[in-house]
């Protein structure tokens, strides 16, 4: 899951859940500018695209995430996960010695929700490259599926599983995650978001405003989605490198 999540393969197909909607709305006082529109993605694709700091291209303009629609349900579902960036795992427990998952760093995670987009600029002819923010996504299997089949390919035992429950967690901008800066700057009360590329003074002002308005400190939160997917599971893979080779094959 982690390998496929990092490479952006997860998943576009065989997903049973609905999607996430990003809405761009023209302000009440504005008579010009981009028209109102919605972008929809499956939740696992949205986990990579609809995140603070990423740039979205649509309707001849560029847009960024400004606010998530965090209702009472989403706020109540904030929970602490434990992640180990070096070993590339995420768990709900402090550690699982059976699978070598110990020494994880705690981080609060909120379910990815529908969101509002803000207009940044118009797309110009000078833009030959489009920006896509690199993110760190970890995945884990949940204890539910709809059964399947087991077979062997060469030396590898493989299971074809239908409706396997998975959870994917976006820890933030990839380079900052490597430096130990986990999570996205989010207000857990109103859902306002700040890009990880903001300078410290901007982050400080953002935190101050939402502390005064919302009555709660702004923190770094991971974004999480759960889904059911059809999958091939290769057993007894010796290393991550071998897993990457098999996945790309």
Model-based region annotation:
Residues 1-249:
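Extended Lys/Arg-rich polyanion-binding regions
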């Amino acid at each position: 899951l982690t390998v496929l999540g990092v490479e952006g393969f997860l998943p576009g197909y065989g997903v049973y859940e609905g999607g996430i909607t990003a809405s761009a709305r023209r302000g009440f006082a504005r008579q010009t500018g981009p028209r109102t529109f919605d972008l929809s993605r499956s939740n696992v694709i949205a986990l990579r695209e609809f995140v603070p700091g990423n740039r979205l291209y649509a309707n001849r303009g560029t847009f960024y995430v400004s606010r998530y629609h965090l209702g009472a349900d989403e706020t109540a579902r904030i929970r602490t996960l434990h992640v180990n960036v070096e070993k590339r795992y995420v768990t709900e427990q402090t550690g699982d010695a059976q699978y070598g998952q110990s020494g994880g760093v705690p981080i609060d995670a909120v379910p990815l929700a529908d969101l509002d987009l803000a207009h940044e600029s118009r797309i110009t002819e000078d833009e030959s490259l489009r920006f896509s923010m690199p993110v760190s996504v970890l995945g884990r299997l949940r204890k539910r599926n709809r059964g399947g089949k087991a077979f062997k390919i060469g030396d590898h035992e493989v299971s074809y599983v239908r409706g396997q429950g998975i959870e994917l967690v976006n820890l933030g901008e990839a380079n900052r995650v490597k430096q130990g800066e986990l999570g996205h700057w989010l207000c857990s009360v109103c859902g306002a978001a700040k890009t990880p590329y903001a300078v410290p003074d901007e982050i400080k002002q953002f935190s101050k405003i939402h502390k005064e308005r919302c009555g709660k400190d702004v923190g770094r939160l991971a974004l999480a989605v759960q889904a059911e997917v059809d999958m091939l599971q290769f057993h007894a893979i010796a290393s991550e490198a071998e897993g990457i080779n098999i996945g790309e094959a």
